[in-house]
Amino acid sequence: MKPTLVLVGRSNVGKSTLFNRLTRSRDALVADLPGLTRDRHYGHGKLGDRPYLVVDTGGFEPMATEGILHEMAKQTLQAIDEADVVLFIVDGRSGLTAQDKIVAEQLRRSGRRTLLAVNKTEGMAVSVVTAEFHELGLGEPCAISAAHGDNVNELVTLALQDFPDEPEQERKDDHPKIAIVGRPNVGKSTLVNTLLGEERVIAFDQPGTTRDSIYIDFERNGRTYTLIDTAGLRRRGKVQETVEKFSVVKTLQAIEDANVVILVLDAASEISDQDAHIGGFILEAGRALVLAVNKWDSLDEYQRDMIKRDINRKLPFLQNFARFHYISALHGTGTKGLLPSVDAAYGAAMAHLPTPRLTRTLLAAVEKQPPPRAGMSRPKLRYAHQGGSNPPLIIIHGSALNAVPQTYQRYLENTFRDTFGLEGTPLRIEFRTGRNPYAGKSPAPLTEAEAKRAHRRRRYGRKKYG
């Protein structure tokens, strides 16, 4: 599991800005609006090859006893309990406040490892701006600027120092782990029970029935699988209960832990933006994907056509590699094809791609459609090899590769996917430009003979060309 970093502090100290910096997103803009900070913002980032989860929280008011502030305080305390490391954010420009002291006392009582980050210190003397914060008794303050990125990597390095210094490892299991994810009440637990052939988990017609990720091992046709039933991922504004908010973390961790994800869509309602957000997170995590459109038996032909059009419009980024199944989890209709699709997606995600064949495929693709020119030069793609699996990573070597456009990258991705049959898994392509051995070097001075020859060539050129 990834280590979880929780951002805590009073309002307007820059927690959401730091969250966006760590996750390289803008997902936490809503956290700046009063009354909306009850909703957690979850994301994942990387420091080099070291992944981590980040939880953004609302402004912390530990002394609040009623209303929204009280609810926010309870949820922040729950977040602290879930944290591996708490990043306590304070404002270096406004200085130490009484509320900062109250929050610091609450964090000391929690027993969680806490790092103190003094934000908004750009252009200020570090020793001066951090001096008064030693009073909080939380160790040496780290001066950062979330807006400009100053010392943010140093802060994360300090937070992760007690965790194994290892990149994300390829799966060592010899059988697929399958996470069942989707919005609440789309039939995830019903589908789990149908695949297992028994009432293994509670399936109830009420959103939020599943609170935690449940791992279930089973065998089918002589092969072992692990199913992961997860809590529903609702749109931020509709999440009310604290326990449900933190079940989101478990669901995101289940996606990271899985080899293949089955995304369950509800055909009885329109495909929502939240379905697209979940699909985007799965794609970003690099997990193989199978889509199950549930409750298909409840629709007539016109409604089925409308749902298919809705899928084409809202989920186009998943259609080039993921298989779609139209099922009824309750009656079992269409579910027999799910596990074969899972096997195919798992095989594609873990596939070994030979270097000679990759290079031949690359050169054939370039010969058929060369990359477009960038100025006076054209990118040169020389050879390719595999750099990892789950998802497959293809590394292409050459020169001037920074000029390869996204459209040509998609062309190469589709070519590799068709050649190797990589259906059901995302495919990553990384370009690496060879090192110039003469970079940073100046030419040696000419000898007397070389200088005379150069002079004769210049004279000849002037006489001939004027």
Curated annotation (Swiss-Prot):
Associates with the 50S ribosomal subunit. GTP 2 binds at residues 182-189, 229-233, 294-297. SMART domains: AAA. CDD domains: EngA1, EngA2. SUPFAM superfamilies: P-loop containing nucleoside triphosphate hydrolases (SSF52540). Pfam families: KH_dom-like, MMR_HSR1. Belongs to the TRAFAC class TrmE-Era-EngA-EngB-Septin-like GTPase superfamily. EngA (Der) GTPase family. GO terms for biological process: ribosome biogenesis. This is GTPase Der. GTPase that plays an essential role in the late steps of ribosome biogenesis. Signal peptide: none annotated. InterPro entries: AAA+_ATPase, G_ENGA, GTP-bd, GTPase_Der, KH_dom-like, KH_dom-like_a/b, P-loop_NTPase, Small_GTP-bd. Residues 3-167, 176-350 form the EngA-type G domain. Residues 351-435 form the KH-like domain. Coiled coil: none annotated. GTP 1 binds at residues 9-16, 56-60, 119-122. Residues 433-466 are annotated as: Disordered. It comes from the Bacteria. Residues 453-466 have a biased composition (Basic residues). GO terms for molecular function: ATP hydrolysis activity; GTP binding; ribosome binding.
